[in-house]
Each structure stands twice: as structure tokens, then as C-alpha cells.
Amino acid sequence: MYSIPCILFAGGKSSRMGENKALLPFADKKSLTQYQYERLNEIFDDVYIGTKEPQLFDHIDASFIDECCHPNIYAPTIGFVSAFKQLKKQKALFVLSVDAPFVNKTMIDAFQAVELGDYDAIIARTQSGIHPLCGIYSRSLELPLHKMIQEDNHKLGQLLKNSNVLYIDIEDEELLMNVNTPDEYQKALKKVAGE
């Protein structure tokens, strides 16, 4: 079990899905969020769900990161700032998007095997690009994140470009498959069922 807290981001708009993807049934669980939470709870001592609407997840006995400080902004920047504010004693956070259900323990172990040291972040990268919502973020990014919010800039790629980042190269693109559209959801359901 890892002592670094894990933040499961489940507060996105889900505009491409047409409904809240965090609440879609997944595998044998009531929701994708429950599936992710229970999996991550076997790897990390503390798992938090980041959302503006914790009442939507009352089917999960979980702790939440309250993202209500900016009710009209649906962006991970808000989740990061809220998490750093709520978890004052933590020097770093492991983050994962709710819509990446195939990130496994072996992959998480690869992040944990690296010393954060002077890095601002340790982020997953595949051949298709970087995956900002899969990795470790240092508290050193808290002030830059606040500044981004003040400037109404929510592009994590830009933050990472201006930071000291170690990228973990992941060969298998499928591990970072996102569930953003109805087609991707159906594909993920088949994959998790072993079809």
C-alpha cells in the first residue's frame, strides 16, 4: 500500500458522452467511479474522489475532495488546488482520471519506484502523447495552479511544459484508454469483461 494520497478526478462535464460518465455502470459495479475507487483502495492507503457533487456518489463509502470553491469551472486545475488545500500536510498527490479504468498496479508501481526529488511531476506518456491525469504532482505546483486559475487558463499541458517533469513511458496504449464517448464506453465494457 502506498502512503501518497490518490485523487480520483470524477468531476468533469462528460460532454462527449452525453451523460455523466462517472456514474455509468462498469464491470459488476454500480458506477465507473465505484469500480475505480475500489481498485485504487487496494493500492493506496487513502483514496479521495474529486467532485463538485459528492451527493451523486452516496453509493460509495469514500472521502471527497470538495471542488465547490469555483462552482462554474469544470477543470482539473480546480481539483488540484482543492486537493492541496484540503490535504495541507501532503507534499505530493497521485492523480488519476475516473475515465482511465485500465491503469493497473504494475503501472502505478512504476511511478512509485521513482523518487520525486526535485521533479514537479511524474507523468504517464505513450506514443500518442502525455496523459496529465495519470501521475504524481508535487506541492511545488500549487502556486502555479492558483495563478493559472486566476488567469482562466486550465491547460495542464502548458503547466507541465513549464515545469520540471519526469515522463514515464508506457508501451501499452490500452492501459491509458479513456472512456469519453459511448463507443469507447462499449469498448471498455467488452475489455473489462475479457471479450
Segments (PLM) and residue ranges:
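Nucleotide and nucleotide-moiety/phosphate-recognizing core
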Residues: 1-141, 146-153, 158-175, 183, ...
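Active-site rim beta-loop-alpha module in soluble metabolic enzymes
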Residues: 180
